[in-house]
């Protein structure tokens, strides 16, 4: 089943990524962490919802990819434009557990964890990776919800922030700094990150449950 929604707002988070806000259809429900198919003018793409489950609007974290794809169109389309919205799907959703939940994200892969935080999930460890400081999206929200928030920047450009941010990849941080523990891991990001992190966790935490989702 498809729904018709309208673009109501676009907020740029840095030079490449923006949050797109759309109307929410009546009786449209989803679980924090799920994604939907958006389509416009023959272009189709899956995007993770970053709204809280009880919010009146639907929000999406989108990275603009230069060219003729959907993200480039959504970066410029007029407020009020109608989009087609598919039904929610995906299984990277929060599972209640007596273990400590560790969320690990790279880039816009932080999206499902934003939705979880906006839906009331708290007390997790979040290891958030980006190329530079501006790519650590939603930091105030996530720091407030997390037990521990760690920002990892692989290509730092501002040494003044060196004291509060880890310089390196999320895999480097987990390898060198994540203490032994009883964890559930949730991974979202690029396929290379998911591959490398899964291999690392299998070695370091063989009894841990690992939930993952890669974006293309």
Predicted features along the sequence, with ranges:
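Ferredoxin-reductase
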Residues: 2-79, 154-155
């Amino acid at each position: 089943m498809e729904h018709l929604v309208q673009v109501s707002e676009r907020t740029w988070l840095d030079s490449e990524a923006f949050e797109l806000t759309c109307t929410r259809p009546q009786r449209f429900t989803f679980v924090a962490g799920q994604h939907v198919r958006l389509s416009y003018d023959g272009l189709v793409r899956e995007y993770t919802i970053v709204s809280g489950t009880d919010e009146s609007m639907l929000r999406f974290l989108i990275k603009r990819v230069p060219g003729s794809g959907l993200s480039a169109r959504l970066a410029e389309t007029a407020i009020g434009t109608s989009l087609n919205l598919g039904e929610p799907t995906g299984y990277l959703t929060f599972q209640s557990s007596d273990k400590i939940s560790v969320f690990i994200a790279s880039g816009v892969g932080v999206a499902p964890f934003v939705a979880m935080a906006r839906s009331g999930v708290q007390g997790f460890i979040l290891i958030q990776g980006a190329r530079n400081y501006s790519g650590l999206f939603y930091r105030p929200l996530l720091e407030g919800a997390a037990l521990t928030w760690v920002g990892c920047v692989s290509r730092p450009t501002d040494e003044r922030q060196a004291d509060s941010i880890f310089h390196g990849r999320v895999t480097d941080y987990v390898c060198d700094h994540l203490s032994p523990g009883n964890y559930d891991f949730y991974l979202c990001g690029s396929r290379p990150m998911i591959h490398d992190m899964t291999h690392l966790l299998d070695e370091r935490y063989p009894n841990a449950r690992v939930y993952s989702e890669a974006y293309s």
